[in-house]
Amino acid sequence: MAVKKAALACSVCGSRNYSITANSNRTKRLELNKFCKHCGKKTLHKETR
């Protein structure tokens, strides 16, 4: 079971605001509502690999 580094990118402006360690066995990409400092509000962030 390998742990892989990934980033969470804002779906509005595209900036990569958060870095996470994720299990590579997961098939779907992680989607979370997080605060984007560039947009100034909570937006949907999607996992980028």
Swiss-Prot record:
What organism is listed for this UniProt entry? Lactobacillus delbrueckii subsp. bulgaricus (strain ATCC 11842 / DSM 20081 / BCRC 10696 / JCM 1002 / NBRC 13953 / NCIMB 11778 / NCTC 12712 / WDCM 00102 / Lb 14)
Family the UniProt entry places it in: Belongs to the bacterial ribosomal protein bL33 family.
- Record-annotated disulphide pairs: none
Please list the GO terms describing molecular function: structural constituent of ribosome
Question: Ribosomal protein: present as a keyword of the record?
Answer: yes
Q: Per the UniProt entry, what are the Gene Ontology biological process annotations, in alphabetical order? A: translation
Record's GO cellular component terms:
cytoplasm; ribonucleoprotein complex; ribosome
Gene name for this UniProt entry: rpmG2
Q: Does the entry feature the keyword Ribonucleoprotein, yes or no?
A: yes
Going by the UniProt record, its keywords in alphabetical order are: Ribonucleoprotein, Ribosomal protein
Any matching Pfam family: Ribosomal_L33
Kindly give the SUPFAM superfamilies that the UniProt entry links to this protein: Zn-binding ribosomal proteins (SSF57829)
The name of this protein is: Large ribosomal subunit protein bL33B
